[in-house]
């Protein structure tokens, strides 16, 4: 493992969190050993006083590396990429790097917040199930349409070529959730669908899947 001899990293995670999912992929790609600490969001573990000391926002993921505590998935991934630079998660090519940042941003600000557990719970108090589903699906459809147009001319085996980069870490969990949680039809997004097929062939992505996490309900395994 890349962090052999160092204190083991600690990842506070929830099996179904797409934000934690993308960090698990990064850790797997880097070959890093870590302790998985489950935070059950449905039971409210994120509001526990001990966890709030680690992350005052009460969200996952949180990464603890010795005295360093990082609570945002993008910040965690960038921290890991700088501390453990192989394999790199950003391409040298400036244009491809910008595309990776754009894809990440679309997921981070345009799609994922609309299916965040806290947001969905709040919305459920205001509208019925059908309206909630339509609201979430609209955000996914809008985001996937933008991603398809962004990546159609630069994708290879993966989002921005034949190497795994930052965009792939954000796309894989989002597509997985869209298909398995929200039954999104991927036919209108052939580039994204092709990328997703490639992810399913990679051990680092397979091992990071929600249903393979230790806190996943047995019915999902």
Curated annotation (Swiss-Prot):
Keywords: Cytoplasm, Detoxification, Isomerase, Oxidoreductase, Peroxidase, Stress response, Transferase. Residues 93-218 form the GST C-terminal domain. One of its GO terms (molecular function) is maleylacetoacetate isomerase activity. GO terms for cellular component: cytoplasm; cytosol. It is found in: Cytoplasm, Cytosol. Its main location: cytoplasm. It holds the Pfam family GST_N_2. Acts a maleylacetone isomerase. Also catalyzes the glutathione-dependent dehalogenation of dichloroacetic acid to glyoxylic acid. In vitro, possesses glutathione peroxidase activity toward cumene hydroperoxide and linoleic acid-13-hydroperoxide. This is Glutathione S-transferase Z1. It comes from Arabidopsis thaliana (Mouse-ear cress).
